[in-house]
């Protein structure tokens, strides 16, 4: 933790560090709210997602300003990527010293920026602080824990996240319950998620299950990929499966023959608007994505999460999410398609009301005085 010149003043900027698609969705309402307050801002894109379909299209869809800098780090092992991120961010923060660094989520760009800023004596604010899966085999869990300990401001999306931070010794005056900025973006674009238009443009079936899988536990082990492919082929006997294929898993799923089933449709990665339209029009969603768990909660679409745990339990207690294993995926999905799962529809998590960006901007503005 550190102190520095007031962030957002004419002499210093609030630096937003983004590097992966979920970061862009979370940053958009914060950048917008601070812009309305006249804050001096700088958007630093690390280039962790370097494909246009994974990155630039999201800036266009969300109306984010063109990044002031793109570090172009790209992919690599966790150590290589994090090291490259830190080198690039240290250069950026030294040449353009920010008054505050705002980081989002739990990707390698998040923890790299927090480490560099803290070592340079620049305050850090973490949006989406306090989420815990309690599974240290997940790289994201390590990133979350380290980032929260380095942060001067911890912006929590749900009450249980505040409890986690308290249990880890984070001072209450650093913690703010603000709601979920990802939901700000979702609610602000509801009239742009046209599932019918997407269905017509991509020639999708009337009834389908949307799938998206990218986590290492699901896509890095060839045996796991083979089993998941078999299960998804079984799902396709119940309903067509439409799956935008993340670059991380494309080669593995191609080798396993996922697209060989006549009722499995594989797509290139989609932009934000198209992806949420695909989700909105689905009869159910199969995923391992944290953000999709949150979006389906608001959209009221049954969500089956192929993970043993989730750092977003509010999507289970308040939303439409259910944890499943590869072994029980098909049976659980069959129930979901028949409406035999208690979806707890309409029970929106606290403060998921489209005003999180304003709350974050308000705290940042007060903090700088």
Task: Map each language-model feature to its residues.
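Nucleotide-activated sugar donor-binding and catalytic core shared by glycosyltransferases
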Residues: 2-238, 249-369
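Glycine-rich, Lys/Arg-enriched anion-binding loops that position phosphate/diphosphate groups
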Residues: 241
């Amino acid at each position: 933790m550190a102190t520095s010149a007031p962030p957002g003043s004419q002499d210093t900027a609030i630096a937003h560090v983004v590097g992966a698609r979920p970061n862009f969705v979370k940053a958009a309402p914060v950048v917008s709210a601070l812009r309305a307050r006249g804050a001096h801002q700088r958007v630093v894109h690390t280039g962790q997602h370097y494909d246009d379909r994974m990155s630039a299209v999201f800036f266009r869809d969300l109306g984010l300003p063109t990044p002031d800098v793109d570090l172009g780090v790209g992919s690599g092992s966790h150590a290589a990527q994090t090291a490259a991120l830190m080198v690039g961010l240290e250069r950026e923060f030294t040449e353009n010293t920010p008054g505050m660094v705002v980081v989002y989520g739990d990707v390698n760009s998040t923890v790299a920026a927090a480490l560099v800023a803290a070592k340079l004596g620049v305050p850090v604010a973490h949006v989406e602080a306090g989420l815990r899966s309690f599974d240290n085999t997940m790289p994201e869990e390590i990133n979350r824990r380290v980032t929260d300990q380095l942060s001067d401001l911890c912006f929590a999306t749900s009450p249980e996240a505040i409890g986690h931070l308290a249990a880890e010794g984070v001072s209450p005056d650093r913690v703010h319950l603000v709601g979920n900025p990802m939901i700000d973006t979702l609610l602000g674009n509801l009239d742009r998620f046209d599932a019918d238009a997407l269905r017509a443009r991509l020639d999708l079936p009337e009834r389908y299950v949307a799938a998206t899988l990218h986590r290492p536990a699901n896509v890095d082990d060839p045996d796991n990929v083979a089993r998941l492919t078999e299960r998804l082929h079984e799902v396709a006997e119940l309903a067509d499966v439409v799956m935008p294929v993340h670059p991380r898993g494309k080669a593995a799923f191609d080798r396993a023959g996922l697209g060989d089933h006549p009722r499995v449709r594989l797509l290139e990665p989609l932009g934000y608007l198209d992806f949420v339209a695909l989700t909105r029009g689905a009869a159910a969603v199969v995923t391992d994505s944290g953000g999709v768990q949150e979006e389906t909660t608001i959209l009221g679409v049954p969500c089956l999460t192929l993970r043993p745990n989730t750092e977003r339990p509010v999507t289970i207690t308040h939303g439409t999410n259910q944890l499943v294993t590869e072994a029980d995926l098909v049976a659980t999905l069959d129930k979901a398609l028949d409406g035999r799962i208690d979806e707890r529809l309409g029970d929106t998590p606290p403060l998921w009301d489209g005003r999180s960006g304003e709350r974050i901007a308000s705290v940042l503005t007060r903090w700088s005085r």
